[in-house]
Amino acid sequence: MRYPGIEIKIEEKELIISTESQRKKIYAMLGTYASHAKNMFRGVNEEYEYGMKVVYSHFPIQLKEVSGKLEIVNFLGEKEARYAAIPEGVKMKISGDEIKLTGIDKELVGTTASRIEKATKVRGRDTRVFQDGIYIVSKA
């Protein structure tokens, strides 16, 4: 991570993020750096976990993990399978109609959950009636 005006140092087992500028934009970026560092330290100590729920009414959705991808079969009775990429660093556990995503990188786990949710987006139909999909139900 690099940004003009922000210095990152490690002194005596402490991470120091500092700036000499008084500008709001640089202070905002300083806070962003600090937040990312805290998330990284927390992720190493305790993994981030997202819980997802498979919801369907008529056509049972079937899930399989296939070579780094989540294969979603029989979504709304479709013949073609839908896929969502599962990057390295994210562990996925499928049990019945629940999916648990875990990993040390908060952004990566959250992005993966979002990709899975978007892979089952209903298009061209009334979403009040067709509520099938895979949804995020918990974050930890």
Give the predicted meaning of each segment.
Residues 1-140:
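Ribosome-associated RNA-binding proteins
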